């Protein structure tokens, strides 16, 4: 037998033996690792996640989510597994599970849920991924196709064959994706009913996420905005939802929702990006890590990170980036700027007259042309770069760009007062009160329409709907 077919046969036979009984379904699944290896993989991935995502700094909320998760996990197919539930300090609407029982839920998703039962539904879905060993299955499938690709590449000398089989492996995993998500939902329904929660909460979460999607579709003019959608429950289609409702009819029992406990736990939850990434209120950004504050043009989208800020014009045609780096105090802003752009020719170079901090600005010859600027403060240089695919768009926005650069300053007491993050406050609706009674723009940081939409989304009342006396309501302060 020729070498390559023989080697492929050996590899395929070895892979074919890699089956294990799925603890959640009782069926044989293709898995190339035992549960001990799966645990080790989860520990390693968990360390990576901890480095990438900050933990939300609220011990009481963390303990509450852990308590709810443990209640559901006790009734899963792997009750002896030590599940660890963690709230991530992220505004995204997402949750995910790692092999071995590590489950993460983003702070942003908690803000839009309306009961403990809905939180339990999200956690039950992720527990289902763990009990069915979906992470181990995906990794095993990827390893299998990778091994076949390496053998084919070895025999043919063509690396593209390996790439093709890797792509095929990826397609296989994506094909299993919908099946795995539905299986996780089916398991979630079982776990919710067994642990005493109302299984209807699973559909309620889907409705919450669908409202988010409808809102984002209506806000297409917002450039660079990403849905940050939940991969799990919302990764569905009508057939999926119909199947869920059919399965739900089997899971009988009243079940609890525990809205009071959830709203009390949620009071004070931060809305928006982590404080360590700067706090944006309307046009005003106060950035603690960078040690500065500045004002952006109305309608611009501002993306703040721990070490940088990028803003986009309303049509997305122009961007303005800001970074900070140490600077030699003996340099002048103009000398620094010239050196920082590698000696390239600067056009219309001048000092920043009227700025709170000493600085300089110029046009950098293209293509594409860019506006560059620098300001000095506390032995640091704050470097701005503005650009656009079309030079005309940048020139049209140049006055706004320069106004933003000139607004850069150290953090004042007023800036510090505005740097407090926006938080959810939970209240009970009184007799005769309506949703509009709770919409107070306050410091004019957002429009009345935007605030109403936000409150509607937070309370699953988008696009229409009103509150009733005695209802819990999330408001923004």
Which functions belong to the PLM regions below?
Residues 415-446:
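Primarily a LysM-type cell-wall glycan-binding module
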Residues 449-477:
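Extracellular LysM carbohydrate-binding repeats and other cell-envelope/extracellular binding modules
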Residues 1-19:
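Sec-dependent bacterial lipoprotein signal peptides
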Residues 395, 445, 461-462:
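Short solvent-exposed coil/turn linkers within tandem alpha-helical repeat scaffolds
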């Amino acid at each position: 037998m020729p070498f390559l077919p023989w080697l492929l046969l050996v590899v395929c036979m070895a892979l074919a033996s890699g089956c294990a009984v799925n603890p959640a379904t009782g069926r044989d699944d293709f898995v190339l690792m035992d549960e001990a290896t799966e645990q080790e993989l989860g520990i390693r991935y968990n360390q990576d996640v901890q480095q990438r995502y900050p933990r939300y700094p609220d011990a009481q909320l963390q303990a509450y989510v852990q308590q709810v998760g443990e209640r559901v996990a006790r009734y899963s197919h792997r009750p002896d597994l030590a599940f660890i539930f963690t709230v991530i300090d992220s505004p995204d609407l997402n949750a995910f599970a790692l092999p071995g029982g590590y489950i993460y839920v983003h702070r942003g998703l908690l803000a839009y849920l309306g009961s403990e039962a809905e939180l339990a539904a999200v956690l039950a879905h992720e527990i289902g991924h763990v009990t069915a060993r979906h992470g181990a299955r995906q990794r095993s499938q990827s390893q299998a196709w990778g091994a076949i690709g390496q053998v084919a590449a070895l025999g043919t000398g063509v690396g593209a064959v390996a790439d093709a089989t890797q792509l095929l492996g990826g397609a296989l995993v994506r094909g299993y994706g919908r099946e795995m998500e539905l299986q996780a939902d089916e398991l979630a329904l079982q776990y919710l009913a067994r642990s005493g929660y109302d299984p209807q909460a699973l559909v309620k979460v889907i409705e919450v996420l669908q409202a988010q999607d409808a809102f984002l579709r209506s806000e297409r003019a917002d450039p660079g905005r990403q849905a940050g959608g939940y991969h799990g429950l919302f990764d569905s289609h009508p057939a999926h939802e119909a199947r869920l409702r059919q399965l739900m009819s089997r899971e009988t029992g009243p079940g609890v929702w525990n809205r009071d406990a959830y709203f009390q736990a949620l009071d004070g939850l931060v809305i928006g990006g982590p404080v360590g990434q700067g706090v944006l209120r309307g046009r005003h950004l106060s950035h603690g890590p960078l040690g500065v504050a500045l004002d952006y043009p109305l309608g611009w989208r501002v993306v703040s990170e721990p070490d940088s800020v990028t803003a986009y014009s309303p049509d997305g045609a122009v961007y303005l980036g800001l970074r900070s780096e140490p600077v030699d105090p003996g340099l002048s802003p103009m000398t620094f700027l010239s050196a920082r752009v590698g000696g390239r020719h600067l056009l219309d170079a001048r000092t920043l007259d009227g700025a709170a901090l000493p600085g300089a600005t110029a046009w950098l010859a293209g293509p594409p042309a860019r506006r560059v600027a620098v300001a000095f403060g506390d032995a640091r240089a704050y470097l701005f770069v503005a650009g656009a695919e079309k030079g005309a768009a940048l020139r049209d926005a140049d006055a706004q760009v320069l106004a933003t650069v000139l607004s850069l300053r150290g953090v004042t007491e007023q800036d510090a007062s505005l740097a407090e993050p926006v938080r959810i406050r939970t209240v009970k609706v009184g007799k005769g009160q309506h949703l509009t009674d709770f919409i107070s723009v306050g410091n004019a940081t957002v429009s009345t329409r935007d605030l109403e939409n936000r409150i509607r989304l937070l309370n699953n009342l988008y696009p229409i709907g009103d509150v009733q006396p005695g209802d819990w309501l999330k408001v923004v302060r």
